[in-house]
């Protein structure tokens, strides 16, 4: 019987390594030894202790940040700046053994965006994910509705009272929150209906990107979009029986428009199906892609009850799941048949973890900014290694995110193909302890491999 019962006793090296593999982007042999002496409760609590927020990202061309400045004419091209924002997110994982960075990727996968957004908006979105990495998924869902990057990505900024756009409300329901259930009638997906999408599309009219960044969210202190009541459908919105036929009162002020969003989010997150869908996402991300009827009944349903009763606290859900006997495959007689070693790493996890475990030496970011930021991270790590291995980091093919997290039955096997597998092997061949990184050579694309394929 699958069980959320607390795992007792010290982890030992095997289970400590399992926990670190699932919860971080990388760790060392020293980390394994340290975590081996901890109980699951102690270890997970440590992983949920996050580092302080680092300074904003640096543009190697100027040696300064461009966030919050008016120096665009001095900076690197916008495409490069976006990659330097990703460096800001990921490089901290080399010095911090915590759940933070994996949770930020989880939130990106579940509130998908891409690199068509501006670098400053990308930074603000990652800061938003960082802020709620162990906070309330419900609260975050409301904040994302006003996120400048999301307003652009799913066309909300084009939505008016006269011409509502259905893109964002459709994806919010189907992909970000409650999920689509079995279709039981024309336009009826059990958990919501086409009528609900149309009503929600009217609710999300009139919100505009604020490129001046003067609209500040009081809870996060981050910029957000700008409500425009004159372009908003100010009438009431009534939803289907899937949402108990609730009516949300239309607003005719900035505050009224924001209250409509809060009321809508509250309505969606009042449903048990929303909590269960989010818990399935957590399970597939941290434990295993396969959710059997037993897992649904004994893990997903009780975990969803815990999540919902605690205002969708990700911290409480993570503690419950990652401290459980089930996570360590200790809830049946065979302790090695299902969970441990049962997931294929994405390229980001594989490459970052390999670099950290084997102590691959990276260029010095202080004395050689160009080689560190541009040649290693941008040209080689993001634009070559991860891309050729099947993961365009923070730039999934569509709004559903990376197929390995949702496309059944293959799921995480999708990370591996005849083409992508070769890059995993080639990278591993250059990850020797103390290696300065043959894959750090410049002009990879010009030579075809230049250090990786030799």
Regions found by a protein language model. Give the residues of each.
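Active-site substrate-binding loop specific to GH73 endo-beta-N-acetylglucosaminidase modules
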Residues: 1-3, 36-39, 48, 55, ...
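Flexible, low-complexity segments enriched for small/polar residues
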Residues: 5-13, 17-28, 271-310, 318-454
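Hydrophobic alpha-helical membrane-insertion signals
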Residues: 9-68
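Short, solvent-exposed loop/edge-beta patches enriched in aromatic
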Residues: 12, 27-28, 52, 94-103, ...
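Structured, charged N-terminal subsegments at the starts of enzyme catalytic cores
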Residues: 73, 81-98, 105
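Short, flexible active-site-proximal loops enriched in glycine and acidic residues
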Residues: 99-103, 114-120, 162-164
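Cytochrome P450 heme-thiolate monooxygenase catalytic domain
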Residues: 105-113, 279-280, 300-301
